[in-house]
Amino acid sequence: MAEPESEPNATFELELFLPGRPLLPKDVKSLGLPETPPSLKVAVTQHETLNDLRITLNDSPEGYWLGAFRFRRPDSHTRKGELVNEWEELQEVFRHDAPHDRILQVSHEPYNETEVRLHIQRLRDLLSGTQSDPASVSVDAGATVHDAIVHANEWAHDAHMPAPPKPSWRGWPQDGTAQLLPALARYPRVLPKCVRGMALSAWNPPPKSWALRGHLLYLSIDTLEGDVLHITASVNGFFLNASSSQKFQPQPHPSKALHSSSLFDLLCAASPLFLQNFALLFNDPVSTRDYFSALPVMNSLPAAPWLAREPKHESDPMRTQTAFLLTGAMSADTLDGSRDWNEELQSSRELPRSSLAERLMRDRVLNRLYAEFTLAAARVVPRVAAGEVAPMNPADAPAAHMYLYNNLFVTRGTDSVDMYRFLGGDAAAHVAVGKDLQGVRRLGNLDIEGLSLLGTVVIDWLGERWVVQTVLPGLFRQVAADAAASQSDGSTASHVAYGGVEGPDTIHTDPAFHKVLSVAGKSLHVAEHKMRDAQGMEHELCLSVDCKGLRGTDGRMYLLDVSRHTPMDVTWLDHDMEGSVLEGTDTASYPHRLPLLRPELIDAYWDMHLHEFARDKLARQRASNEASSPSTATSSQVDVSDFSLNFHPDAFAEFRTGSGDDARVIQPATDESIPSIAAVRKVSEYLRKEVIVRLISDVAAGLTSAVDGIALTNRMHARGINMRYLGYIANLSQPSQRDHWDQSVVSKLGSGHEALVQAFRRVVIHEMVVRSAKHCLRTYLRALPLMEAAACIAHFANCFLGTEREPSPVPKMPEVIPASTASRSESHKPWMSLTPAKLVEELRIDIRKRFRFELPMFFLETELRKPQALRALCLKMGIQLAVRDYEFEPEAKHAEGQAAAPSSNATKEKTTTSSRSGLSKKGKRAFPPPPSKPLRTTTFVPEDVVCVCPLVKTSTPKSSLSEDAFEAGRISFVRGEREIGTELMLESIGFYEQVYGLVHPETGKCYSKFASFLHHYAAEFAIKAARKASADSNQGSSSDGDRIGTNDAGSADGSKTEHDDQLPEVVKEVFTLENALRFQRQAVTVSERTLGLDHPETMTQYMNLAMMEQSSANLDDALRYQERVMQLWQLLYGRDHPDVVHTLSSIALMLQMRQDYEPSLRAYEASHDLAVRLFGPNSIYTGNMAHELSQALILSGDLKAAIQVEKEAWRIFQERLGSEDPLTKESQALLSGLAATAVRAAKQQHARELVQTRMPSSARSTRSSAHHHHHRHLHQQQQNSSSSPHPIPALANRSIDDLVEYIQGTPGTGSSRAARKRAARAKRS
């Protein structure tokens, strides 16, 4: 017998026979529901289990309706076969079966109460569709507008609105905040309701006598026909009973004898409208077109948009019964015990990982578990903050309270026990908590065997930072024992097995811990070092003395307090803790003394020195080999095992020693003669003198940029730059600091780089302002009741951003139930006395302290971009506002701007020609006007705040298996191993989907990378195939002699091309533009739902998708995506970012390809005008835009304007690139052709006018009529720029050389001297 394939992840086909559905009508397929196939063939892997297949089947269109079922081997049509163990791997199940015998039957089985509850919950989930859950941590989470953008016509049809116009360029979209959501997506989609209501019946639980007859639960369902169905769920399935709301009769209904093993089928038979609407819901067009928009976000928290559509709140009786459906508990004693999160995490980490299948299973379990733990933490923090959970130590100060809820250990991220008092108090504790999470994540990614880490989540909620951890086994028992020992003998007891206890006074070591942590220290590039305790005894440690090793009662070794997993930034300690700030004279003190370096900097510095060491050693090795044996001089192998570069984790760190009056602060590790301590200073200086300088230089060279604070943070962190250096970067970005940039880059910079640096500097200063605003708002929100949060946020936003509309905003309390006398006496809070002037001063002070920078005078009043600042502040604070255009200008000024907009010039960037967006028609109202609302006196009101959601930072480790597999496939493909590279990349995508799920940020990035790879090589293969076809065609049409010569000359070349064209079948099947588009579309949807609708990465995905649609000739879709990109540009930065020039140019090119020359010309003009305004008239960027604009003018028939613009381009190319540059020569050739054509056209016009003046009027009329069509094309070329240009479609797809040849005319034609010269040159050639 044949066995399943032996490859680790090989797939084989399994055939399943599903049970019938007798209650469904025969025409169910015509209604839209899929028919139950007689057999279902499923592709599975040999390491999957039937339990995995069960999950897949329950989620499939063919098996969603199944209730309780089991897998059996086929026996006969009337008799069930033997049961199959569902936890056994499929390779074991079918080990002795031939491929055609891999068959299983799916048979209905008796229900138990758990399976009934799960079946009901599955029905509720399917019927609710995209209905929002009021119990979720945010509103409108996981929203996507991708389908509304690309299928705007369908959305308009469903909303009974006029179809939007064909995409084109009509000027910038309206500059409003509401464009985060396209106009069509702002209206809630109305999905069909299948039932009016569904709930567990009030007759639950079944009486004991009926439970003995198999009754499990009772349901009450209100159908669309107006009937109330009372349903009994029994061990044999579901049936209609004879009960009513007043009378209990659980036996089958006498006149409605309906029974089914599936509740879906029972309702379809009992309610025709349920069947009809369920078919509509099942075939929802949006989820059909974009499958990823309807999938649940499972292994990560969905993105919460800062402008949220507040859903309509509907009655759902089963919403409060969900807890029973999930747990089955009706009393406290029947409630299942809380999950032991720590045991689950540690046991999951200890799963075997020796084989590929085991690693895949382990990564999948870990990511799912971390996602559930993170969600539980996000739900518990608001409850703890609201006082719903009693503290474990109620006698202590509130800041020191500890909470234990559902086995989650919750504490505030503050200095509650004065541990950080000498380092900055709460400010230092706030930083330490974040760094501890970073250390846990970093160590988790290292995945060191034998080392256990607590599950850790950091949550920012209403101005407070909270830490949620799993419970270390035996922690509280050890703490109690230590406290008792301390009271009995007065000594300081400790349960710490490794590391220091509140500093270096007491240090413990343990050989077992030392062995495990030495592996961690080596991976972290941390040097083993010696520290002295209070008695002067030396202890050798692998990590910082602050890191603590504890033994749990479960026998595992746990590592805690890993905040100082990187060394201190000694340069910052020496120069920036006190003193004057940059670009100012005021002095300020940095908030804390815990400035740590980033791990990315440590890794980059270590790699740089490793490469230098390897290069030097290789050079010496080659020189030595040359002297001894020339034949071995080319060896490239070098041994780097003797390379050593490690960093002292406690170098220059400050510790408090002693207690009471004897307490003092010491720095025990400052001897820079020790290499590991000296390395700490060197890497700190490397950050300031090279890394930051290189960042600014790369920005000036156009190698990197940032569109908003999120992108800026990612760019800085990727290079290892802390955000405290924002002020230093802003100062270094000034033109006056150019001498401090990388001179090897500066020497190659041309005119226009100033615009790139200034745009970057603006983003940097904006980020400082928004971060300081976040710190100030945190102060006001901290310890504020939830009911006052919206009023506080609205008043703060008015003082921060709404002063132009209302210079003196007055706080407004929300309308709530009148407060009691006690609460009224405490009604005056600090936020209520906030004024704009006070806030400006607080922001300036905070920027001085945290970023060592003096904010430019009047920056907040004149240069702050308020829509972008509002967006950034909401994202940093977890604030969700109602969807509307927030007006920051006075009402009169705004009305004046709105009235002036229709008469503005459409080609200028400073105005807007569209009343809704860049694609709306003038003079036509495409959507109903918004409902009238009372006039506002301020920009924000408390009712604008829809939700405040917790901001979650998690320690979830990444799956190295997925990343390694994709990278291995990519490298193999590039090296020429096409088939194995393709298979590895496809396999890695499957790994990503299994480990992270289909809707996850990491999966979306994988889709995007693979789409770009597919697009690049699919285009390359297509070009090679076209060249080969062209070569074959030319070869076939040439003479015999030419054919022989060509073959002799290019035999080697031709053999290589032939080899490249012989691609494996899997490569031909996968590497297509259609597949590239499919994966990129998936990447866009996943990015919107997991990162955010306006995340910089989402905008990049839209740009890539537009480019791929353009290359596939889907120009309308490409233009729709480009319109979305323009909207995102306005939201993230504004209309004048340097990269917008390229976006406008791309739009113009797409319109030109579609032969829409007039809007294409306007887009080119907009791009050129923006380039002149940003880069100046002499920049190479301006020259490129002028060159493109001149070609658009040629296609529009405006030759005179084309000559003027091309003269500008040629002058710039001549000055910047020189006369020998190909671009200069191309511009010169085009300009010469245009000039010759203009001269010839002028002479011909002059000749015609001279002939007509000498002819009688009647003859002129006859001649003009006879030759009207003959001269029509020539008249179009003669029209000057003041006339309306006419397009020349014949020139649309021609190259520059073709254009020049067309304009100059065929050699030998024409009577001018220039024509005769061209004819002579043509003959000589």
Curated annotation (Swiss-Prot):
GO molecular function, one term: mRNA binding
CDD domains assigned: CLU-central
Compositionally skewed regions (Basic residues) per UniProt: 1265-1275, 1314-1325
UniProt cross-references to InterPro entries, sorted A to Z: CLU-central, CLU_dom, CLU_N, CLU_prot, GSKIP_dom_sf, TPR-like_helical_dom_sf
PROSITE patterns membership: CLU
Region: Disordered, residue numbers: 893-937, 1032-1063, 1245-1325
Keyword field: Cytoplasm
Record Pfam families: CLU, CLU_N, eIF3_p135, TPR_10, TPR_12
Every Clu domain range: 311-573
Main location, first listed in the record: cytoplasm
Keyword Flavoprotein: no
GO cellular component, one term: cytoplasm
Compartment list: Cytoplasm
Biased composition (Low complexity): 1276-1285
Listed GO biological process terms: intracellular distribution of mitochondria; mitochondrion organization
Entry function: mRNA-binding protein involved in proper cytoplasmic distribution of mitochondria.
Family membership: Belongs to the CLU family.
Subunit relationships: May associate with the eukaryotic translation initiation factor 3 (eIF-3) complex.
Protein name per the record: Clustered mitochondria protein homolog
Record organism: Malassezia globosa (strain ATCC MYA-4612 / CBS 7966)
Gene (UniProt): CLU1
